[in-house]
């Protein structure tokens, strides 16, 4: 058994015990206490354990363990800190919860404290052999086969002096040339300056782990997903079933397909001199756009995505109205400016940027009470989530992080801030209209009580209660100033919004809070947010998979992610009750099937014939979701966490109630 620890204090972060060991040890077990130095496994010493430590527990010398041999650490070496582990694990979005996985499955995979020195020496020997071959001018294509044959002829795999290799190599090179019938030497002078430098083993394993778990990929470990999902949900809970980890991946992919970040970024600045604002809107939405090459914009069909539209009011005091057409990637490197995001119709909202303006007088110090103010905000936000989405038992800690940005130049007298909410995956909004409706519910709840976010304004002797949260920007073609943006008035600098801190951040992330894209409403989602739990994932999948394409994209068919066999099978099944079907792509990559017949269509949701109401199904790679716009309640009783999907029964489509894990 070995335990990977952090020092000062001695805390267990990874415990690898023999399967035969019991949690309660009757007799002391010999083992090792280990750490990492420059991300390489090192042994601090051999010990007798009196108990098997649990992850996160503190180890007490002479109580939990007794030293057998305590090995010295080179004074030039510095044991890695927990912060370094967390920072590396944070590259995948898992943060601290992923540290045990980082240590056990990657850095310490196959690590045996008694044999580590031997294997490290073998690894070093390989580098020495490759450099020896480079000096002799042997072509690099033959290096590995030579090393492999050298190892094969050894009696046992272990490090040997380089002179043993030098005695063996001449005959080996001759045999290799005879075997291949060509010279194994290169004729250029690269050998004069080339040197093989193999990275250390721990770095190779670490790089592989990060590549496999990086937030921009779809391959994510179960340990990482379980760290994000609700740890309290177990297979024994009713109406939830087993935790289907792939469902969370599918939801994240569905959301990101709606965001649709291009591979190559662009940044175009235009002024409203030769074009109009509505021409820019039509260009972004690809809604019968005009040719805007006159302002150096590329042809619209050259952009396979809906770009981000920003308003730049840095020159508005001179009557120059500037707009920027760009994308999320390009905004990451843009220097600070006076930017406001224009909300385009029909686009997903994964980040909600609340505009907070609160006037006050007297001795009120909002910065001194910022923690209390934000706790109140999160509490009301939680209530709004439950009311708007009709959820009853949502954990407040799981609704998502709130990052606070404050424009200090407005103080005193006015608290001007941006409370940027990164909602849980299931709480993202289909479009800005839905986000505006949610904000309206949020405002109503705030206005019911007295808090920092409600104040009184008196005009002409009439007092009016005002909500500090402004919902006006949340409308199509309206705009809201981004976090980190500067404010300009009459050509004068009025301060910039600055990041203060984050609240309700259950999952640690490596977000760039100082970058200009931090508050973009259509931001990609990564494995750096919490999930409400498996009982909510399928409802969100059905909600976002059904979003129709809202712009006339010539690339719409290219965005379909459903396999052709799934579409063909669904078409064949639904045609048994609807006849010919219309196939329409959605912005999420799924497909909507709609009957061409306009009357007397059988509805799978209400289990009856509709004469006028529209019916359809959404086809994904996993399920078929029935849809209907008739206001009557469904024929099936759907409990919280359940959903309707379509299955084949005796050759006909039938709707059933499904749950997570089915």
From Swiss-Prot:
GO biological process: DNA replication, synthesis of primer
GO molecular function: DNA-directed RNA polymerase activity
Superkingdom assignment: Viruses
Name of the featured protein: Uncharacterized protein ORF63
Gene (name only): ORF63
